[in-house]
Design a protein with these regions (language model features):
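Non-catalytic, topology-defining segments of multipass membrane proteins
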Residues: 1-181, 202-223
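Membrane-interface helix/loop boundary segments of multi-pass membrane proteins
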Residues: 184-200
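Short, small-residue-rich loop/turn micro-motifs
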Residues: 199-202, 244
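Hydrophobic transmembrane alpha-helices
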Residues: 208-247
Length: 247
């Protein structure tokens, strides 16, 4: 059917094989490309920049107000627009690779009744920003409100440097585990019919399809943020975790 086929068989990462291969797993985790490099390190970098340079100080979240929400929403929207927009422009507007690595040779539909406005991209973009980024921002601002009002334990990064560095990298493991569990849950038939089917309309996904979900699924998806109600916390953790989920 003209679908792209990889040159070689795609296998499981060595961390997920049996019998265990600890040496191969460690090599994969720290290799390039591997588990941390390049993408998870990229999310760490974006998250740290977002908190330390693109966010108000923690105390600003103590009195929840619309301005704080809109600042966070604007920053998150900028990240999403830049990230997905770059892939969309390069691969779907310029079509720089044409069909060379495209699994499905068709392009996203712009005449389909199953999508809002009859257009897959407009449908996906609307769900991404109106629901996805809004709920992402809600979890972020909510957790930071708890932290700024001393309802959860906030650490000093300099005084707890080892813990800070460890958590910055371990949050990806939590995010991946949470995604696996949530994904299994939303394939439970009632939840699938109610919410997850919206995501699965994208049988020919594009860059904007990743966050094109029903609001109920977004609530499940971004609930990875709730971990920080229970563990010693630094604001950078929540930003990195949600950047990992959102991008």
């Amino acid at each position: 059917k003209g679908h792209y086929k990889p040159d070689k068989r795609v296998g499981y990462p060595p961390i997920f094989v049996w019998p265990l291969k600890p040496v191969s797993a460690l090599v994969w985790i720290f290799s390039i490309p591997g588990y941390f490099l390049p993408w998870n390190l990229f999310y760490v970098f974006v998250g740290l920049i977002s908190w330390f340079y693109l966010s108000p100080p923690l105390e600003a979240y103590a009195d929840f107000n619309l301005e704080i929400f809109l600042i966070a929403f604007a920053r998150n929207s900028f990240l999403v627009g830049l990230y997905f927009g770059a892939f969309h422009f390069r691969l779907y507007v310029q079509r720089a690779q044409e069909l060379e690595f495209k699994f499905n040779p068709r392009w996203p539909s712009n005449k389909s009744k199953q999508f809002m406005f009859g257009n897959q991209n407009l449908d996906n973009i609307t769900l991404t920003f109106a629901s996805g980024v809004t709920i992402w921002t809600g979890f972020e601002v909510g957790i930071l409100w708890f932290a700024s009002n001393d309802y959860i334990s906030v650490i000093n990064a300099k005084e707890n440097l080892f813990y800070f560095i460890a958590m910055v990298f371990l949050v990806h493991l939590w995010r991946d585990l949470h995604f696996y569990l949530i994904h299994r849950l939303i394939h439970f038939e009632p939840l699938y019919s109610l919410a997850h089917r919206v995501h699965h309309k994208n049988v020919n996904p594009g860059p904007w399809s990743g966050l094109a979900m029903h609001p109920i699924e977004h609530l499940f998806y971004f609930s990875c943020a709730l971990l920080y109600l229970f563990v010693p916390f630094h604001p950078a953790f929540i930003i990195i975790t949600l950047v990992h989920a959102g991008l």
